[in-house]
Design a protein with these regions (language model features):
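Short, solvent-exposed coil/turn linker segments
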Residues: 17, 35-39, 95, 328, ...
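Short amphipathic alpha-helical interface patches used for protein-protein assembly/oligomerization
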Residues: 90-94
């Protein structure tokens, strides 16, 4: 039997309660129940005048608007406002009645630029939600997984100019310089001369590139980098073999249960190993015992940083980068007592020098190697001298190799796909994390903070709901 819809129902006048229109198991209802949103008032109280100006929009409502946007992965604030106008659940979550006027799409942007810009409000919101997860004893920070993903910036790839780049000091540069000087002195070598002031920048700990103003007169021998004229704070990122985009790098840490513990926003052209210190500083005093990272973080400086702090680095196996047909580095045995290397033909490679990068160079005797039957497998140098390098912090890398081969470490490393990689996949698929519609690092930080906050809160709310159902 066919039933025809009566269009008179569209104009039917009814007395309804907004709360009755939102299902009890709706996501926004269980999220609203999960935490007390009044904590936002304490965070923003100093950003409002107590007795001057017109009454403002409720700060909680103001923060919940972008929260809805990132929770549901809505493309823009303009589209978010349109969805709020017709979605009863969104109105209920914001505390709006059915006939209340929805704020204009520019309201949040104006409040951000006038009140919130230059503050750490959104990082505080993220931290408060994370503390709630700690309060329920859901977070286990003993094993921390760290990785980075890239978010496409709102920048035209064709609108760019070249800039002169002056690389800033790495976080370990001063410590490495002292180690090099000490090592050279132990071998009877003079200290290396300091580089020109133009080639170095002191007082930095992040390892970022510092740029001069736009210029057309780029020196042939100077390092240049492509910089967007639309969003200069983004970085030129190589995405795949033939594709490049302007992007931001989001370095993130989580525990073994998938709770996001911290993040750091950097230009997309910065390598993970250079930006690690910024994130690591935010993870101090959380009780971290193991730090699981991918091959991009496998450097002597990071190994030393973690081991000196009592944290076990869990690095993956990294195959040798030797050319095919040549001896691998591990085939040259290091004699710690005599401080030399022994080649596969039992010849000695003696210490030569320690370079600026912190590598000790061990060289063979060219006259002996010239007559060696393994010369074609050892070196292709014209003077027949084989050079093997060893970092001044190589013992830390050897300690990390011992940790890697410990029982259970391989299995622990395999959990990356279930933790940090799953977080990135979920954020990109469900929360609009593939690209950003915002300009600048500050606004990108806001987006990341609220996105990760809503992911933690969503997970917390669902766990609380399961507990309530079990206790019912």
């Amino acid at each position: 039997m066919i039933t025809e819809q009566n269009e008179k129902a569209r104009k039917q006048i009814e007395f309804v309660c907004t709360d009755d229109l939102v299902p009890q198991d709706h996501l926004l209802r269980i999220i609203d129940k999960a935490i007390d949103w009044s904590f936002i008032y304490d965070l923003v109280r100093d950003k409002y005048s107590p007795d001057q100006g017109r009454p403002s929009i409720d700060p909680v409502t103001l923060i919940k608007i972008p929260f809805i946007q990132y929770l549901y992965g809505i493309k823009s604030m303009r589209q978010t406002i349109k969805e709020i106008e017709v979605n009863v659940a969104f109105r209920w979550f914001l505390g709006l009645e059915l006939y209340d006027k929805v704020p204009h799409f520019s309201t949040f942007g104006k409040n951000y630029s006038r009140r919130f810009e230059g503050t750490d409000l959104f990082e505080q919101i993220f931290q408060h939600i994370l503390e709630e997860c700690y309060r329920f004893k859901l977070v286990d920070p003993t094993e921390v997984f760290v990785d980075a993903t890239h978010v496409k910036a709102r920048a035209n790839n064709k609108k760019m100019q070249k800039r002169i780049a002056h690389q800033e000091a790495l976080f370990y540069e001063e410590m490495l310089r002292k180690e090099i000087t000490s090592d050279r002195a132990a071998h009877g070598k003079k200290p290396l001369k300091n580089k020109d002031d133009d080639d170095q920048s002191s007082g930095s700990s992040g390892g970022h590139d510092k740029f001069e103003d736009y210029t057309d007169d780029v020196p042939l021998d100077g390092k240049t980098i492509k910089c967007s004229t639309t969003d200069p704070e983004s970085g030129w990122f190589r995405k795949g073999e033939h594709k490049h985009v302007f992007a931001y790098g989001i370095e993130t840490a989580c525990d073994k249960n998938g709770w996001i513990l911290g993040f750091d926003v950097n230009p997309g052209n910065e390598h993970d190993s250079r930006t690690f210190k910024g994130l690591y500083d935010k993870l101090q005093n959380i009780g971290m015992e193991k730090c699981v990272v991918d091959a991009g973080y496998k450097t002597p400086a990071i190994a030393k940083l973690l081991l000196d702090d009592g944290v076990k680095p869990v690095f993956p196996y990294k195959r040798p980068q030797t050319k095919e047909g040549f001896f691998k580095k591990y085939e040259y045995v290091y004699d710690e007592y005599n401080d030399c290397y022994i080649c596969p033909n039992d010849q000695i490679l003696k210490y030569s020098t320690t370079n600026r990068d912190g590598y000790k160079e061990y060289k063979s005797c060219g006259h002996i190697c010239e007559k060696c039957e393994f010369l074609g497998q050892c070196t292709a140098s014209k003077n027949h001298v084989k050079v093997v390098t060893r970092h001044v912090w190589e013992e830390y890398m050897e300690a990390c190799e011992d940790i890697r081969q410990t029982l259970g470490m391989k299995e622990l490393y395999s959990h990356r796909k279930e933790t940090i990689e799953r977080i990135f996949g979920t954020a990109k698929e469900n929360h609009g994390f593939r690209y950003t519609q915002m300009y600048g690092k500050a606004r990108m930080t806001m987006k990341v903070a609220l996105t990760f906050a809503c992911m933690n809160l969503k997970k917390l709310a669902k766990i609380q709901q399961e507990w309530d159902l079990k206790m019912a």
